């Protein structure tokens, strides 16, 4: 099976593909990939052919879709207008380009991945999706609820099992309440956080389970 990984970033997809014999993955990103390109400037029709990939996986940058940006309005010159402009001029073009490449390549299956808490779901309304929690597929210590738009059928998504059942949770020593070991931000108040690069990873189990259905 041949997979194209758009916005490869942490290379979660090729790392997961290495678990299966016969799977190969071609990566695309600004650096450290098979195609080191800005997808907005890339003439992909010269490098790629329709139907040469069985699956296209795309993880468009989530930064400009994050609702957390709104909490920074008033800081560092950020305004409601600039947040909206960044979404429309920096975030959406990358998403639209990914959708355009998928349409051109005509893969058997596709997956577009992004945080479920972000605004990308406001702009992808025509595709079916699944919602998963990373803590149900890894021992990474944090939840990170994620949305997967895909035409893959038969996938059974898993979300957090909750207190006492989720191995990634612990009791807060101060309040006694259950919480995930790590926060999906820089942390604080006695709780360790995560780096952006760590949060950008996708658990191999999610990738393999999806691709096994292709």
Curated annotation (Swiss-Prot):
Keyword field contains Phosphoprotein: no
Catalytic activity: a 2'-deoxycytidine in DNA + S-adenosyl-L-methionine = a 5-methyl-2'-deoxycytidine in DNA + S-adenosyl-L-homocysteine + H(+)
Superkingdom as given in the UniProt entry: Viruses
Residue numbers annotated as active site: 62
GO biological process, one term: chromatin organization
MF (Gene Ontology): DNA (cytosine-5-)-methyltransferase activity; DNA binding
Keywords: Chromatin regulator, DNA-binding, Methyltransferase, S-adenosyl-L-methionine, Transferase
The protein's Enzyme Commission number: 2.1.1.37
Keyword field contains Transmembrane helix: no
Function according to Swiss-Prot or TrEMBL: This is probably the methylase that recognizes and modifies 5'-CpG-3'.
Protein family: Belongs to the class I-like SAM-binding methyltransferase superfamily. C5-methyltransferase family.
Remarks, miscellaneous: About 20% of the cytosine bases in the genome are methylated on 5'-CpG-3' sequences.
Oligomer status and interactors: Probably requires another subunit for function.
Protein's recorded name: Probable DNA (cytosine-5)-methyltransferase
